[in-house]
Amino acid sequence: MIISLLHLNLNAQVFNFTSEEEGKSITHKVLLDSEYFIETQYVTDSNEFISTRGGFYELKEGMYLVRFEFNSNFSSDSLKTLNYKSTKWKQSKALKQDHSGKWLMAGRVRNGVEKRRTTSGARKTLKFLLDGHFQWTAFNTETFKFHGSGGGTYTAQEGDYIETITYFSRDNSRVGAVLPFRYDLKGMDWHHQGMNSKGKPMYEIWTKRVN
């Protein structure tokens, strides 16, 4: 299968385009850096989540071969790879922020006690941040089981990190919610504190992905 892209600069970028399916306008949002690619689809009018898929890619003969780490529709389409080439997408305005890059959930702090978890196993939670846009996805690289995803826009400045939810696979009623957090960058780690989408306190530790 081949899906279109045109003249993608290998710097971190965010793209959007729309398609029509069964009379509905579908928004496709693409997060792309020099090695990793995510495409997410949601209904344009309601922001209802449809699907997401992503993974590392390589450029071969003008085509982007994406080898998926996750595919929310894997149980129905069994896709593990996809080729992208040649068409024009609309690039979002670049808004450089702290945190840009790929992060893996590395642990939590509860009652003042830090508990780490491995980031090298098959079960991962990835957060991809580019140009003021974010997406987190929970998945298993071995079984392709999809555990959920959400994304939108964010700002990060002087310890304040604020997310605005555009799509959320688990609960569409959370679309539009604004979630304020505090952050602290410590070496390769991002300490992330506040209230989660259910209004419960959380303290997460994310670590910069290096592979």
Predicted regions located by residue number:
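Bacterial N-terminal signal peptides
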Residues: M1-H7
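Beta-propeller blade signature
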Residues: G151-A156
